[in-house]
Swiss-Prot record:
Subunit structure: Part of the ribosomal stalk of the 50S ribosomal subunit. Interacts with L10 and the large rRNA to form the base of the stalk. L10 forms an elongated spine to which L12 dimers bind in a sequential fashion forming a multimeric L10(L12)X complex.
Function description: Forms part of the ribosomal stalk which helps the ribosome interact with GTP-bound translation factors.
Protein name: Large ribosomal subunit protein uL11
Residues passing through the membrane, by range: none
InterPro entries given in the database record: Ribosomal_uL11 (IPR000911), Ribosomal_uL11_bac-typ (IPR006519), Ribosomal_uL11_C (IPR020783), Ribosomal_uL11_C_sf (IPR036769), Ribosomal_uL11_N (IPR020784), Ribosomal_uL11_N_sf (IPR036796)
Organism of this sequence: Flavobacterium johnsoniae (strain ATCC 17061 / DSM 2064 / JCM 8514 / BCRC 14874 / CCUG 350202 / NBRC 14942 / NCIMB 11054 / UW101) (Cytophaga johnsonae)
Phylogenetic placement of the source organism: Bacteria, Pseudomonadati, Bacteroidota, Flavobacteriia, Flavobacteriales
Gene3D superfamilies: Ribosomal protein L11, C-terminal domain (1.10.10.250), Ribosomal protein L11/L12, N-terminal domain (3.30.1550.10)
Keyword terms of this UniProt record: Methylation, Ribonucleoprotein, Ribosomal protein, RNA-binding, rRNA-binding
GO molecular function: large ribosomal subunit rRNA binding; structural constituent of ribosome
Amino acid sequence: MAKEISKVVKLQVKGGAANPSPPVGPALGAAGVNIMEFCKQFNARTQDKPGKICPVQITVYKDKSFDFVVKTPPAAVQLMEAAKLKSGSGEPNRKKVASVTWEQIRTIAEDKMPDLNAFTIEKAMSMVAGTARSMGITVSGDAPF
């Protein structure tokens, strides 16, 4: 018989840097999870992504055991990395802060494909381009699709 789910916790934690301090400690402590065990497992799984923000979905069961799924870094974070920005525009419709190419959009879309609800790479690219526009980042060149 399957385990009964008690709670689902979603967090964004830097890869390889989970520790019991906020936001990890309070969120998992309230769910009754062994925080140090989660931190050890998370850091082991994300050691290849040091410093990158990794969304994680933790499923806590009634017997206080847990499973977790690490997702790819958010498109906004990858776009800021590609455009070498610290933050997006405060007024994205008026003030453009950077520009990225369609090749950069494609690499981000290919990386994000498992987490996006898109069937083709072109649709995933248009989703990432929409995120870029909402951040005040222009996409240079003609769309390849």
